[in-house]
């Protein structure tokens, strides 16, 4: 894992900004655009403000082994942290989607009587500045779902917490058939493990990834992504979900999935989408559990980040 300086830094990179603007490609007059995604950026540090004691308590409760941090050399541009009782996230003010969303799923959240609200209270997030956030109109007629990262189904006991999952800061543009079927079933699997084992820590987010960048013979240093609406909400190429919980042996266990943002057949073998946490970190520039960097956590670090289960866990969770 990697660490980063936690001191407050400026958001603006005078060198990178005009390059990225020059690379922006608008296609026709539709609400969907294409733009060049830089695969590797120059050094940049995100701003981090201090937390109140209440915020620190929420982060400690929801983010296992520390709040995710940026890896050095991976400037994610201007971001805004959002802390709510049910989740903590970091939202990209450039892409208008979260980089990651942390949750803790336990008996206080799951197995309640709440169903999906009707109508669903999708809305822009007042904690983010207008012009640097997704708006409802960006998704309208875009052809993409407003895809939850912290799902509404993870909050079935308290209406206010479920309503909080409907802020657009917790959404990414997601292919509807993917969002409503294959991805939803993955969310249900994770909830099942949390219920079976009593709790689970979950980190979910988008990826901008082109497999050609893994091979020096095909890597170009950039690739095309799509964006929707007047606010240019970035459409991720992939989504990841990480689950960490205690197995039947009492030891911490982890499993992570990466799925392309596309349509899937009716029956999906989720084993095909298992990846290591380290693999995801290397391709997102995010250190998901920074406290594992401490020397006393070296063995656990190795176990959680590098192990790749060969099979999807059974319904009652891992050994």
Where are these regions (language model features)?
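N-terminal secretory signal peptides that target proteins for export/translocation
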Residues: 1-11
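Intrinsically disordered, low-complexity sequence elements enriched in Ser/Thr/Gly/Pro
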Residues: 5-7, 18, 35, 41
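Hydrophobic alpha-helical segments and their boundary regions
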Residues: 11, 17, 136-137
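Hydrophobic H-region at the start of alpha-helical membrane spans
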Residues: 15-18, 91
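Bacterial N-terminal signal peptides
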Residues: 17-27
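Domain-level detector for secreted/extracellular nuclease and nuclease-toxin modules, and
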Residues: 25-319
């Amino acid at each position: 894992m990697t660490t980063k300086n936690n001191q407050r830094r400026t958001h603006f990179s005078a060198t990178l900004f005009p390059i990225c603007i020059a690379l922006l490609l608008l296609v026709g007059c539709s609400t969907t655009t294409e733009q060049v995604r830089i695969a590797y950026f120059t050094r940049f540090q995100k701003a981090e403000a201090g937390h109140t004691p209440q915020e620190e308590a929420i982060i400690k409760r929801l983010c296992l082994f520390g709040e995710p941090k940026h890896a050095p050399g991976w400037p994610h541009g201007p971001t805004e942290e959002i802390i709510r009782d049910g989740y903590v996230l970091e939202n990209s003010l450039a892409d208008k989607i979260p980089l990651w969303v942390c949750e803790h799923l336990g008996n206080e959240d799951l197995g309640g009587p709440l169903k999906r609200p009707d109508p669903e209270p999708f809305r822009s997030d007042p904690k983010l500045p207008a012009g640097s956030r997704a708006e409802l109109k960006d998704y309208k007629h875009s052809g993409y779902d407003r895809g939850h990262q912290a799902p509404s189904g993870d909050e079935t006991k308290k209406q206010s917490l479920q309503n909080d999952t409907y802020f657009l800061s917790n959404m990414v543009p997601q292919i509807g058939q993917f969002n409503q079927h294959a991805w939803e079933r993955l969310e249900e699997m994770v909830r099942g493990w949390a219920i079976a084992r009593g709790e689970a820590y979950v980190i979910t987010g988008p990826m901008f990834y082109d497999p050609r960048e893994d091979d020096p013979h095909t890597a170009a240093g950039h690739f095309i992504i799509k964006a929707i609406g007047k606010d240019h909400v970035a459409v991720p190429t992939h989504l990841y979900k990480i689950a960490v919980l205690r197995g039947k042996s009492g030891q911490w266990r982890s499993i992570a999935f990466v799925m392309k943002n596309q349509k899937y057949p009716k029956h999906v073998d989720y084993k095909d989408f298992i990846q290591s946490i380290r693999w995801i970190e290397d391709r997102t520039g995010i250190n998901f559990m920074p406290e594992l960097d401490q020397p006393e956590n070296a063995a656990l670090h190795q176990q959680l980040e590098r192990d790749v289960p060969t099979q999807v866990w059974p319904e009652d969770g891992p050994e």
